[in-house]
């Protein structure tokens, strides 16, 4: 009798186990779940470093028989990967035609100091915005969104007759994509 009870208990437990197994579970056909996102093209000018020429000496060092005054600065950009871009530099706040100029002491006929900006070396390829006689710097697409920094080469031509004082200008950097 104990054996029959044991057998009945085993059969009942086995039946319950089979009924709960996936073989007997109800199911429906599987359906794909669509997951989407879009990544927009985006670029920003993320940093700049001033083009600081330092002292200009029109009497000896930078006179017409002297040397040009050269220096560098930089423009940093961050862009969506795979996005080809260009960086434009406008003519500045004090330009005369296509000539960039730094403003000096007010009220002087010699209140401007001419300068130029370049993409590759002082006196090399002029860096502009396409409207100021020079082209933007075209950049190949990046494989990541890390900041990329580009050197801005600056030159103040020798032989300018300017008054004593501080000279400055502001150039707008724009990333086009």
Regions found by a protein language model. Name each.
Residues 25-108, 137-177:
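N-terminal small/polar-rich segments of proteins
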Residues 119, 124-127, 163-166:
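Short linear motifs in low-complexity, proline-biased tails and propeptides
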């Amino acid at each position: 009798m104990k054996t029959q009870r044991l057998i009945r208990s085993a059969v009942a437990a086995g039946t319950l186990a089979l009924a709960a197994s996936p073989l007997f579970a109800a199911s429906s056909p599987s359906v794909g779940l669509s997951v989407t996102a879009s990544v927009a093209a985006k670029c920003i000018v993320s940093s700049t470093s001033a083009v600081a020429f330092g002292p200009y000496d029109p009497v000896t060092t930078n006179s017409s028989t002297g040397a040009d005054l050269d220096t560098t600065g930089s423009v940093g950009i961050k862009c969506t990967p795979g996005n080809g871009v260009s960086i434009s530099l406008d003519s500045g706040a004090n330009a005369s035609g296509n000539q960039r100029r730094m403003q000096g002491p007010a009220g002087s006929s010699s209140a401007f100091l001419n300068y130029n900006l370049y993409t590759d070396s002082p006196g090399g390829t002029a860096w502009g915005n396409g409207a100021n006689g020079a082209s933007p710097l075209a950049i190949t697409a990046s494989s990541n969104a890390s900041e990329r920094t580009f050197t801005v080469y600056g030159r103040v031509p020798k032989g300018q007759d300017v008054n004593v004082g501080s000279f400055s200008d502001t150039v707008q950097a724009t990333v086009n994509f």
